């Protein structure tokens, strides 16, 4: 680096002379564009030679792909250029050769642009293109002026930014480089497509955009680090005309004054046709013909934009410093995955989107997307902010200057402006970020402000294309391409730059609500620099917006949860776009809350209503049949066996174990390592035990009050005191912490762990208190009948949310069953508990006895590798049991379990059987099922070989049973049957995914 700097410093005097000559020549119009470009690029390459070497390994894979792609394109199109430039290229490094390729491409595009410009000039003469292309070209014009202004500011010496801000700049430069590369890649694709369609006007826009973005990125490279800043300022000074240099030197000498500002503004308008840097000069000279047609319009507009961007820069740099969220890495990671499409907020319903399609289309076309892009990039650099005093003065001066022009221009401009305003209001509504920073300056269209959000990019083709029909067709295919090409890089970038403000702060996945009408008056005061009659219009729009927000607030609560027409979902629209996972989760969570509100005291009533639906005779018949089938859970298979007599005795301290074995280690631990609970004792000097819940394989559970937390009720799980159980307890502790950290807002229905401690060598885990598990609920309320369909629907929503969180954390629960699902007092909210069997998805040891038998998936039984699908299978079995009160597959052995599963779904696919480690226990060499049963007469085992197994169990008949269901409930039962069919697929690859389950009609549609 040092060597490069000294070398370039040595060359500077020579370059300055050359450049001054060049700029004098430029004023006389003597230097060709080619020469200026060559000089510019050669100088730049020399300067940044070492930086590219350091960067090499940072983004190698992405950039290599881009370079290959570019070279392929260029060599195809410009072979004749290469012949001409061969003599130059032979002695050059490959990096310089790519530069010359760029120049060759630019020349070629130059010719095309001249043709297009001629066509457009003809159209302009006839007055056809007032709103469309003309305004876009004007947008580019003012954009290049903005760049000139940036140079001037850099030269005037605004170096007040600290070192931290310079590092921030570095990060952003890296990002900007990547985005410009990606953009040029996808644009080159689009350009070839446009050429084949012979749509020249579009091609023209693309070309201009390509050039300006390229020049932009070149210039941004100059301000890389504080050590290089002086150099870049020299360069800016060189590339300007002598008169401007003289004037700016005078300015530096003087103290800043309001007149200074006036001089600056007037200089801008006078020296529009002077050159500021070779590349800007190109695009400007092209547009000059266009500019001369409506100079007043342009000047007014560009100044308008300039003053606004200044204010926005200063304001945003202030607010950004305050608003940097410190996020936990786990949360960051998850947001990267889930928040793919941030800027489509819940406020933006399909209805609102289509309020004024035509004018919006027009205004979108009439404004340069590049401009917004550039503005948003500038707004992040702290060195370009103005002091508040100067800002106010320049604003008032400009307002005075603009007044007469505005009167003249009101007619052609008002319509696009109005629509911009209305769109701004709409999007202001939609973006929750505004709620947090009312002082922040809004850009013209807040949705487009986040220049690096993938969604904004994917929308840009829609803005460019002309006819609405073509716009729709083009948008779908192009946005798909872009999203694919950018999502990977974007995600990596987002996680890397923690310094920058989080783009998705305030997105609804972080538990925020859609009510932003906080400071709409203040917001609007910032940009009401239009005429007085527009004030009334703004006020009117604001009132309309509030009405719409109110309407949708109620709609979100009342309307059916149908996928296409849900206003509260940001993505769902009539254009067959599937909702994002985040929207689905939001919607389901809202539904669960609503169910909780509505059914606080109705649980028992709904179960009784279900009892009444059963016909009396068949009820008697079923009870007689039921006597034959023993209750599968009377034994200690029950996780929290509240009715387990020896546990009650043990709780009372009457257990006979101690008397029988006087050589026990301690008085408080029994022979099996369980802690002897005494009602009334105090654990860890703060938990006063008042009740005994039950006992599981790993532990027993007591109810206690926390004296340190105002007698808050808790459940304390006391792990058995032996090595294996302690290990299991610590593993459960680790998984619970991971799950709780990933779900700070408690939306995903996994049990909350408060803390843990050791008591007399037993590990104790302190949980939130929950009254009973679903096994007990079924025994108490729904024995042989099951629960109401409304309750089953809500429970299924909550279970799928729990599965979603498990998958996010890469955890398998591996023991989901009604015993391990706890409910609150009102039976409206459930929590998945008991993570003693849980494992990381990668550590899935193949064992045929994982998961309780009735809920064990077929892939576990045959010894095939497994993943999240085993938990989905368990949930399916549990849901059937909740609705019917009966166990779906009450198999006595693994072999019997397979037989019952195949009775429902038909024979297991041979492809799946072959992958099983234990297939020989259940299938013969020809893959026929060997059904092992005990002969009732001889009571000996007999094997029946079954080559084909036809599904004989009718799920729907079992679900409906002997109920006389009303029509709405019958519909829900049919939906439940369909959902269970998809969950209980024998092949885990064909089983429904969690997201698909959350979108199923049974979950989405209310009763």
UniProtKB/Swiss-Prot annotation:
Posttranslational mods: Phosphorylated by CLK1. Autophosphorylated; phosphorylation inhibits interaction with its targets, such as PRPF6 or SMARCA4.
Entry's localization field: Nucleus; Chromosome, Centromere, Kinetochore
Record field: compositional bias (Polar residues): 1-10
Phosphothreonine found at: 385
EC identifiers of the protein: 2.7.11.1
One BP term from GO: spliceosomal snRNP assembly
Broad class of enzyme this protein falls into: transferase
Biased composition (Acidic residues): 518-533
Catalysed reactions listed for this entry: L-seryl-[protein] + ATP = O-phospho-L-seryl-[protein] + ADP + H(+); L-threonyl-[protein] + ATP = O-phospho-L-threonyl-[protein] + ADP + H(+)
Biased segments, Low complexity type: 157-168, 562-581
Protein origin, superkingdom: Eukaryota
Residue numbers carrying Phosphotyrosine: 140, 849
Binding site for ATP: 693-701, 717
Annotated crosslink Glycyl lysine isopeptide (Lys-Gly) (interchain with G-Cter in SUMO2) location: 99, 111, 117, 170, 177, 593, 659
Domain called Protein kinase: residue spans: 687-1003
Oligomeric and partner information: Interacts with CLK1 C-terminus. Associates with the U5 snRNP and NCOR1 deacetylase complexes. Identified in the spliceosome C complex.
Designated name of the protein: Serine/threonine-protein kinase PRP4 homolog
Gene symbol of the encoding locus: PRP4K
